[in-house]
Every structure is written in C-alpha cells, then in structure tokens.
Design a protein with these regions (language model features):
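Conserved phosphate- and dinucleotide-binding cores of soluble alpha/beta proteins
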Residues: 1-142
C-alpha cells in the first residue's frame, strides 16, 4: 500500500500510539506495517503527555489463564472475539516505557498482538482542533 489512514486511541509526543479500542489492532498493525506511509487522524482528545492503560491485547484462547497471569495486570473484555477469533483483553499496568512493554508483551506466549504502535511506523498525525488541524511529522515521506 502507498498510504494507510487510521485513527488512534492515544498519541504520545514521541509518536508512540495506543490503538485497538475496537479490538481490530492486529489487522490494523498488519495494514500499517504494509503501507509506505501511515497517517493517523485524531481529534484533540487523543494526544496525551504520556501513554497510559488500558492497552488492548489480542490473545489466544488456548492457555488463556496462563497468558493472563503473565501479562498482569490485565482484564478480559466482555466483547465478541476479534475478527480473527482472538480473545480481547486490556493491559492495565504502567506504560512509562512503551518500547520495553511492547517487547515484553510480544514475547509472551499466547499474546497474538498488542495495541502499542511504535513511532517508526507513523508517518504523520493530523489532530483536528475545531475548524483547523495540526500536523505532526514523525518520519520522512510524509
């Protein structure tokens, strides 16, 4: 893909995103990684000084109890399965170091994907502010 445009639940000043409030973050991440440019459109409530929980998780149903123990503190969402049949949960712990947390979550058996999107994926963020918008560029090609 040349260009992918999507929203975000949180946008940090350094370009880290939390996505997946709707439970489709695995597919969203695949599409964003496949695109040459990934542009996020957000309203003025989405930029945050620092990321915080909850961070969406997609988990395998097999070994769910063990996976939940390893990613604690976390809770299961009372929602349907993801588009690919995964169980949707939320991580509620600290997100002060999103890079380390992303590695930890990605390395946990049973975690299909998490909703942390690193800044190297993000080309630009457009933040709507009433009748205008601010553009924040994160990588070349914007």
């Amino acid at each position: 893909f040349d260009l992918t445009i999507d929203g975000a639940d949180q946008v940090a000043p350094d370009g880290w995103l939390v996505k997946g409030g709707g439970g489709a973050h695995t597919r969203e991440k695949i599409v964003a990684r496949a695109a040459d440019r990934f542009v996020v459109i957000a309203d003025s409530s989405k930029p945050v000084p620092a990321l915080h929980g909850p961070v969406p998780l997609e988990l395998l149903s097999f070994g769910l109890r063990a996976t939940m123990h390893r990613v604690a503190p976390a809770s299961l969402r009372d929602v349907p399965l993801s588009p690919d049949g995964g169980v949707i949960a939320d991580y509620h712990g600290p997100v002060d170091d999103p890079a380390t947390l992303a590695v930890r979550l990605s390395g946990t058996p049973g975690v299909v994907e998490h909703g942390l999107f690193p800044p190297e994926m993000v080309t630009a963020v457009l933040v709507g502010r009433g009748e205008s918008a601010d553009r924040i560029d994160f990588k070349s090609g914007a």
